[in-house]
């Protein structure tokens, strides 16, 4: 079954949870080549990492943030730090952490500092988090896409139910029907910052090139809105 809480998928103590089907198993505090170095490239400030040196300047694009429905705060806040978001499991000794930036920095892949329930396994360029290759939500959404097939709309059946189970965990309303556009959006939101969006886009382009070219040409490329 899907893991109960979406944000828990990206915490060290929840590595190898029942939803994790294939994952890269890094060595906590391991040597170069067997350690997860992404922490320094993802975290935007050292407050979130308990003073550990990090240097990311990556931000969520406007186009990505626009994929989230208004009520989809669970997945959004587990993936990006949006202004005013509170994380009780980061900076635990100080009562939690509230993001006060004016852009949306990366949260997924940033589990906090050494003392934030991470057993001390946080160093610069060294995180204990597994890297997902395949989790059950991917199987569910792939199944939904297969059930939609070449049809314009899917209005029922196990494929729609599979997609709605993913939405249930995010505590957002169920869909009564889905289209190809819904599949794209759901996958982008569910797997944002899990390094699979490019592969999805290439696959979809080979299937529906005209649709995807139009999709690419109408994406918002900026990081700010005037």
Question: Where in the sequence are the language-model features?
Answer:
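In a subset of proteins, long, contiguous C-terminal domains/tails are tracked
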Residues: 201, 206-226
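Bilobed periplasmic-binding protein-like "clamshell/Venus-flytrap" ligand-binding domains
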Residues: 188-204
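Flexible, polar/acidic helix-loop-strand segments at domain edges
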Residues: 66-136
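Structured, solvent-exposed acidic/aromatic patches
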Residues: 1-40, 102-103, 120-136, 149-161, ...
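An aromatic- and glycine-enriched ligand-binding surface/loop that stacks and positions planar moieties
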Residues: 1-95, 213-216
